[in-house]
Amino acid sequence: MLEKQSVNQKEQYNFNKLQKRLRRNVGQAIADFNMIEEGDRVMVCLSGGKDSYTMLDILQSLQKSAPINFSLIAVNLDQKQPGFPEDILPAYLDKQGVEYKIVEENTYGIVKEIIPEGKTTCSLCSRLRRGILYRTATELGATKIALGHHRDDILQTLFLNMFYGGKLKGMPPKLMSDDGKHIVIRPLAYCREKDIERFAVAREYPIIPCNLCGSQPNLQRQVIKDMLRDWDKQYPGRIETMFSAMQNVVPSHLNDHKLFDFKSITHDSDIIDGGDLAFDREALPLNPVGWQPEDDEDTEKRPPVRLDVLEIK
């Protein structure tokens, strides 16, 4: 009995620490990018996945202690996927006491009709969803649209653009929407996916899978995701260092002449951003920048995180 109590206490301690870390990361991102302001009405896009559930949960928690007043409204787009459990999200949101709206649009049928079997559906599906969500934000009077992309999504996008698009371009934490009418924010920008996974398991969210995304195992994004996860296992701290690099860009030491005016450098110019060692090899830190091992994380002993996903028939 005492042993069981001890285990429960340790689990609660670890959960509290995890929740505090997520709150801290979300709060820091909101502050760094001025994501939420006094009087904002934030439309939280809720897909039924672990990321959007966690985003709504943490935003609700921060709302209670924030020095500013803002409101939240959860929005789910019912894309009419066969077997989609329409009762799950309303029941969950009613229980949480969250204002919400379910938008019904048959984007699933449109995508299936237009995209040939075996081809990637993400681009069209995303474009359709985006237009519907922008329209809904206008109807609801939302001043911000919150999406559930996290730190790992941002890094994956960076590598996708480098490997396939020839660009150093990631996923911005805050941006103006395509139609020029809405501000889109990503409050989970500083949050690790593995933290979100553990939090979702502890919270026992009713996870709803996507029949479109989940049926495409060879997507380029999945390949990048697997690569980064392998790096994280083999070289602890590498992911944190790469994300730190995205926050410490030095345009004068890249090769984009549109971003930095190399032509203006003359013998009279000052040393820019520390100059360059030119003939000497730069000394690099022994430990990864931006990484600190979590004292509650014993990755060798902890079993893999498994989310309970609802079965769609």
Swiss-Prot record:
One MF term in the entry's GO annotations: tRNA binding
EC assignment: 2.8.1.-
Ranges of Basic and acidic residues composition bias in the record: 299-313
Amino-acid positions noted as binding [4Fe-4S] cluster in the UniProt annotation, renumbered to this chain: C122, C125, C213
Cofactor(s) this protein cannot do without: Mg(2+); [4Fe-4S] cluster
Any single biological process term in GO: tRNA thio-modification
Keyword Chloroplast belongs to the record: no
Region (Disordered): 288-313
Pathway(s) served: tRNA modification
Catalyzed reaction equations: cytidine(32) in tRNA + S-sulfanyl-L-cysteinyl-[cysteine desulfurase] + AH2 + ATP = 2-thiocytidine(32) in tRNA + L-cysteinyl-[cysteine desulfurase] + A + AMP + diphosphate + H(+)
Compartments reported by the entry: Cytoplasm
InterPro entries on file: Rossmann-like_a/b/a_fold, TilS/TtcA_N, tRNA_Cyd_32_2_STrfase, tRNA_thiolation_TtcA_Ctu1
GO CC field: cytosol
Broad class of enzyme this protein falls into: transferase
Position of sequence motif PP-loop motif: 47-52
Chief localisation class: cytoplasm
Summary of the function given for this chain in its UniProt record: Catalyzes the ATP-dependent 2-thiolation of cytidine in position 32 of tRNA, to form 2-thiocytidine (s(2)C32). The sulfur atoms are provided by the cysteine/cysteine desulfurase (IscS) system.
Assembly: Homodimer.
Similarity field: Belongs to the TtcA family.
Any further remark recorded for this protein: The thiolation reaction likely consists of two steps: a first activation step by ATP to form an adenylated intermediate of the target base of tRNA, and a second nucleophilic substitution step of the sulfur (S) atom supplied by the hydrosulfide attached to the Fe-S cluster.
Protein name: tRNA-cytidine(32) 2-sulfurtransferase
UniProt organism field: Yersinia pestis
Classification lineage: Bacteria, Pseudomonadati, Pseudomonadota, Gammaproteobacteria, Enterobacterales
Gene name tied to this protein: ttcA
